[in-house]
């Protein structure tokens, strides 16, 4: 729902972290679990990074990217669940509060309106009712209505600050896109993507070897650079290499 790993980690960490501490979980374990599961926020659509990649890659279908994110996101989530369950059992963590079946049903029905946003946004984009950009507007309006009138988690007096924070974040993203576009043009003008492509293809023309090398490089890059600028800067370098090997832009 958040569309961002950072947003998912921040939101869930602030909510789940204190609860886990009350239940007796180690802070290290809680932090590790939160960080490890955060990437599902950008893998399972809607995802802002996928929209950014669609822009940089020359118009890759956003709907196709969204659909391609479901299986990796679900597999990542299941893998995290299995590992966390194993270590929770090993360390003897137990939930001190038990919930009745009626409470579980009540919470489930309370969550349905929020979960419906995924169905509305993704369904609308895939069916062609609205574009990805229009889908983001639908998501904002729908979540605003839920927050104000259904869940009542925010007040009207808080809206100005929320709008200002959103405008600030949008301005930062637009600035990053502008600067990264200039850098991409400079790299294309100086022939850097071609040089990198020739160097990597000189190592191997096996697509799996090339993908392995790219993943290692992106792993290193990701330790000091945020996802959005990394996507904007390095997609124009690595994507032509994969296209030369016949890879689909969605797969990349």
What are these regions (language model features)?
Residues 1-252:
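Alpha-helical transmembrane segments of multi-pass membrane transport proteins
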């Amino acid at each position: 729902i958040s569309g961002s790993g950072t947003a998912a980690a921040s939101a869930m960490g602030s909510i789940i972290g204190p609860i886990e501490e009350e239940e007796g979980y180690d802070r290290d374990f809680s932090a590790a679990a939160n960080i490890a599961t955060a990437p599902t926020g950008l893998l399972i659509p809607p995802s802002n990074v996928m929209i950014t990649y669609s822009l940089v890659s020359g118009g890759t279908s956003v709907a196709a990217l969204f659909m391609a994110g479901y299986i990796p996101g679900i597999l990542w989530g299941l893998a995290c669940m299995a590992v966390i369950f194993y270590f929770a059992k090993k360390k003897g963590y137990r939930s001190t509060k038990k919930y009745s079946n009626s409470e579980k049903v009540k919470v489930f029905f309370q969550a349905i309106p929020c979960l419906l946003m995924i169905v509305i946004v993704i369904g609308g984009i895939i069916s062609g009712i609205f574009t990805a950009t229009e889908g983001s507007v639908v998501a904002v309006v729908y979540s605003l209505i839920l927050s104000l009138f259904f869940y009542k988690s925010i007040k009207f007096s808080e809206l100005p600050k929320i709008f200002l924070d959103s405008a600030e974040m949008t301005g930062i993203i637009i600035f990053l896109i502008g600067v990264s576009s200039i850098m991409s043009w400079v790299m294309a003008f100086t022939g850097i993507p071609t040089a990198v492509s020739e160097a990597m293809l000189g190592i191997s023309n096996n697509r799996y070897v090339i993908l392995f090398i790219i993943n290692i490089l992106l792993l290193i890059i990701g330790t000091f650079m945020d996802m959005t600028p990394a996507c904007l800067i390095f997609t124009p370098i690595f994507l032509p290499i994969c296209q030369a090997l016949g890879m689909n832009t969605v797969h990349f």
